Amino acid sequence: NWNDTYMVTANMRADGSSKLAPHHRWGYFPSAAAAWRISSEPFMKGTKKWLDDLKLRVSFGTAGNNNIPVGQLTQEYQAVTGDPTLWVNGFNTMWAPSSTMANPNLKWETTITRNLGLDFTVFDGKLSGSVEGYINTTKDLLIKFPVSGTGYTSQYRNMGETENKGLEATLTWHAVNKKDWGIDFSGNIGFNK
């Protein structure tokens, strides 16, 4: 933070998960944000009568997801109850392979978020609002995929990508602001694709 005009923050997160393949076990997820209080600049002095605050902000961040059951890297076996009807190599057995096929190459599902926003306050704090645009992308989705014809029912895989983007706007009018009570009117609108 420099002179309450330029603000920057950054973060690095490292997550490890035994649910994922050894060569993909660690995920590194950086994030950063910056803001510029435009209203503090000398060239904005002519707006002081009506503009209280104007701030532009931008952010970028990543996050990981490993929300799958434990034991998807190697083939699991499950106990068979009742009279064993499963034969392996000519011998009946009380244990059967899990219906989910193992996948030794699973890695982190990663979500990337990008935001650009503008916040403002005008007329001695009577009116405030913000406008924000965003793009969110999720890569390497962890999906339980059907694998018919293999003897198994499904397998967890990293596949696919999703993206959503949108625009949001908020406006608040502080109609009454007394010592012990107040009245505010707020509205927002959003578009998402």
Where are these regions (language model features)?
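Extracellular/periplasmic, surface-exposed regions of secreted and cell-surface proteins
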Residues: N1-K193
